[in-house]
Amino acid sequence: MAKVLYITANPKQEQQSFSLSVGRAFLETYKQHHPEDEIVELHVYDTDIPYIDADVFSGWGKLQQGQAFEQLSKDEQQKVARINELCEQFMEADKYVFVTPMWNFSFPPKLKAYIDTICLAGKTFQYTEEGPVGLLKGKKALHIQARGGMYSEGPAKEMEFGDRYLRAVLSFIGITDVETIAVEGMNAFPNEAEAIKQQAIERAKDMAKRF
């Protein structure tokens, strides 16, 4: 039995979102073809995700100096504990599905905050004499990303930073088996938006069977 962590980063309702609609189609098909697997849904806009702030840096610093967790301030304890909880949840999964829109050539800021909680030295990667080494080997990920324009090819290709950044981070922590479903062109070709979504849904369903 595999554990799937389904991560969404979109404040919209599912029926209003291209990425969430495609993501839901993927998830329901996955459940049908992998009924024994455990699926955990994490919606970052409905979840407490601490930002890396002064309390977090202060708490980490005290722990590195040998202070007990109980000696941290209340805010430091709460934020550090929550970050550890999110990181542990991520580490326990075998497969990951990220569902995001493209905002200003990248993804929503709440996802960046979440990514900061899963990139922890000693947990998801470690430093060695040869450089950093990712510790999450043998796992796989899928990124479903909605883009209003066309970014897979053409002059705007180099302006797509969300999928490329996510792939870089996942590779850094050891996850190199990553696929992407790009739902793109809905704003550039509004008359074709529904057809674009349906094509992406069919691709997502097909991928769910073998993911």
From Swiss-Prot:
Catalyzed reaction equations: 2 a quinone + NADH + H(+) = 2 a 1,4-benzosemiquinone + NAD(+); N,N-dimethyl-1,4-phenylenediamine + anthranilate + 2 NAD(+) = 2-(4-dimethylaminophenyl)diazenylbenzoate + 2 NADH + 2 H(+)
Residues reported to bind FMN: S17, F18, S19, M102, W103, N104, F105
Keywords of the record: Flavoprotein, FMN, NAD, Oxidoreductase
Note accompanying the cofactor annotation: Binds 1 FMN per subunit.
Keyword Flavoprotein attributed: yes
Record GO terms (molecular function): electron transfer activity; FMN binding; oxidoreductase activity, acting on NAD(P)H as acceptor; oxidoreductase activity, acting on NAD(P)H, quinone or similar compound as acceptor
Chain's role: Quinone reductase that provides resistance to thiol-specific stress caused by electrophilic quinones.
Family of this protein: Belongs to the azoreductase type 1 family.
Subunit annotation: Homodimer.
Official protein name in the record: FMN-dependent NADH:quinone oxidoreductase
The species this protein was found in: Anoxybacillus flavithermus (strain DSM 21510 / WK1)
